[in-house]
């Protein structure tokens, strides 16, 4: 078989099993995110480029691709997320059209660009969830390109999908083999009594985290965003990689926990808060039965750590505990988490801004050598920060990825420019590295001293701001939202501090002064604040005669 640029190979597949099931809990979360980003949710598609072993023929590569599709139910599942039931259907036969792309010299960079083109459009309901391409050059097939619908697989699931191509790829697959369990099996387990029990336990843990966290990690008002609004900035640091690994070894925690602590410290300092919360992407693969499933099991787990003392070691232990519990929490029904969140928001009086994320892909620790201050400083001088192109879509204010490229730590950050200025994002990345480096070179420093070394400026409140329930509340914004939601009520806001704890009081104009007046429905007020990250429901409504407006 010879390949020509622009042609499409037709790979016919046939498999014995054709099954249906509801979406798994992980798929439900992804389906909601896709709906939120409509009509342009292609940014969620996974994309990969894998180098082909030299000397292979095109028909050998095509045969391996056929074997992958036939072995992986996820690669031949059709999705209809809005259906009342059986939202995923595994097909038994069909045709996969493989794009052929020719280059004079195929490089990894050009392969990634071609994979991005494959992933550049959303998957339709009648599309197979995998697009495959072959990049060739004068020597023959050079790269297999994959674009995967995120409903079909997450990052780790894609690794096990490409395991089926191991005989034609140069990649190392010595860490095991895929599970015989498929997403349909996962969905059936989740609807079982055992699955419902595990989901209920997980939701109880998440409710405790949601009850502790600040309303938002960036208590600020939006500004006119740049175009494009959402932008990627990446830092590549050898010094950061080495120091992160050394801190993990020194304190007996995971590298992800160290990254979580450093990012939490930066955000809490920026915001002037004593707690930090992050949504952590958890693969749900701690169990032996789910470790190697080809599918989308990843869910976002809320974490919250206190940053109210001077001990950096304590912060590392808290982050390690948060990551440990998040990893072992287990799967949970996505709709159940939405209900828990609404219950907590109603109780606390404000909508939670859960748009700050950490996705760590630091799976294999880097060997940590003995500290060498001169080498660390030399490597830190080579750290690079650069902005990436492209028009991104997101629902996040800040999404941070931790990856390793050989001995380089890559910190990729997606920011919403309505809340984060480009110069700030760069400064926060540098601060992240600075905390890691300084914690290694000067282990006696406290957390406060470490973040002070970065030069990042902390939030400074004015008279318009008040800290209530570990969150910054903007009084003018809250008043404006209440006036819009309660048009028949004339009121102003006041802050009381009985027992030292601040509370928000709405003083309502009434002929009868000094009495508590009936408050509007908690649900009505919280919904009126939806989309506002710096407003809250008053704790009390008190009547007062005369004009009460500011």
Say what each PLM segment does.
Residues 9-18, 54-70, 86-127, 314-323, ...:
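A short, small/polar-residue-rich loop/turn motif at beta-strand boundaries
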Residues 14, 26, 101-105, 130-185, ...:
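Active-site-proximal acidic secondary-structure segment that organizes catalysis
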Residues 18, 23, 29, 42-49, ...:
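Flexible, Gly/Pro-enriched loop and linker segments at secondary-structure and domain junctions
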Residues 1-37, 63-106, 126-128, 182-229:
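Short amphipathic alpha-helices and their capping loops
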Residues 38-46, 73-74, 140-141, 194-200, ...:
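His-Asp-centered acyl/peptidyl-transfer active-site segments
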Residues 72, 76, 162-163, 274-281, ...:
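Extended, hydrophobic beta-loop-alpha segments that form or line the acyl/peptidyl-thioester binding
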Residues 9-14, 18-20, 40-60, 125-145, ...:
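Gly/Ser/Thr-rich phosphate-binding loops and adjoining beta-strand/alpha-helix segments
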Residues 78-79, 169-181, 209-216, 423-459, ...:
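A short N-terminal helical cap/helix-turn-helix that marks the beginning
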């Amino acid at each position: 078989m010879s390949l020509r640029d622009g042609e499409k190979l037709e790979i016919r597949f046939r498999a014995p099993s054709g099954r249906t099931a509801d979406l798994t809990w992980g798929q439900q979360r992804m389906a909601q995110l896709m709906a939120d980003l409509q009509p342009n949710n292609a940014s969620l598609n996974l994309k990969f480029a894998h180098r082909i072993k030299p000397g292979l023929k095109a028909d050998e590569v095509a045969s391996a691709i056929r074997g992958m599709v036939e072995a992986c139910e996820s690669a031949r599942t059709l999705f209809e997320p809005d259906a009342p039931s059986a939202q995923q259907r595994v097909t038994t036969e069909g045709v996969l059209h493989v794009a052929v792309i020719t280059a004079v010299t195929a490089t990894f960079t050009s392969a990634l660009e071609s994979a991005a083109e494959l992933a550049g459009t959303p998957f339709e309901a009648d599309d197979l969830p995998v697009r495959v391409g072959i990049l060739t050059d004068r020597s023959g097939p050079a790269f297999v390109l994959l674009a995967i619908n995120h409903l079909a697989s997450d990052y780790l699931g894609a690794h096990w999908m490409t395991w089926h191509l191991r005989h034609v790829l140069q990649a190392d697959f010595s860490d095991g083999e895929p599970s015989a369990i498929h997403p349909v099996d996962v969905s059936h387990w989740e609807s079982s009594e055992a699955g419902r029990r595990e989901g209920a336990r997980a939701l109880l843990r998440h409710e405790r985290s949601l009850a502790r966290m600040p309303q938002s990690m960036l208590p600020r008002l939006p500004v006119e965003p740049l175009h494009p609004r959402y932008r990627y900035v990446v830092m590549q640091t050898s010094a950061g990689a080495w120091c992160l690994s050394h801190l993990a070894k020194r304190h007996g925690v995971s590298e992800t926990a160290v990254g979580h602590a450093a990012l939490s410290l930066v955000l809490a300092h920026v915001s002037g808060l004593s707690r930090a919360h992050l949504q952590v992407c958890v693969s749900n693969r701690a169990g032996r039965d789910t470790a190697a499933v080809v599918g989308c099991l990843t869910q976002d787990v809320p974490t919250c750590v206190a940053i109210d003392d001077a001990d950096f070691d304590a912060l590392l232990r808290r982050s390690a505990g948060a990551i440990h519990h998040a990893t072992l929490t287990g799967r949970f029904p996505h709709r159940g988490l939405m209900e828990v969140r609404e219950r907590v928001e109603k109780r606390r009086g404000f909508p939670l801004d859960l748009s700050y994320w950490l996705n760590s892909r630091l799976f294999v620790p880097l060997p940590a050598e003995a500290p060498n201050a001169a080498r660390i400083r030399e490597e830190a001088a080579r750290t690079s920060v650069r902005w990436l192109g492209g028009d991104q879509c997101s629902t996040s204010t800040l999404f941070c990825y931790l990856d390793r490229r050989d001995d380089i730590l890559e910190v990729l950050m997606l920011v919403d420019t309505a809340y984060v200025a480009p110069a700030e994002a760069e400064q926060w990345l540098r601060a992240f590295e600075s905390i890691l480096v300084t914690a290694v070179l000067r282990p006696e420093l406290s957390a406060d001293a470490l973040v002070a070394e970065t030069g990042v400026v902390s939030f400074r409140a004015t008279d318009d701001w008040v800290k209530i329930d570990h969150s910054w509340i903007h009084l003018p914004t809250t008043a404006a939202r209440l006036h819009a939601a309660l048009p028949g009520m004339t009121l102003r806001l006041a802050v009381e501090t009985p027992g030292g704890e601040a509370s928000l009081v709405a003083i309502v104009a009434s002929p009868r002064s000094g009495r508590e007046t009936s408050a509007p429905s908690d649900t009505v007020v919280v919904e009126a604040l939806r989309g506002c990250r710096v407003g809250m429901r008053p704790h009390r409504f008190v009547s007062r005669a005369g004009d009460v407006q500011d």
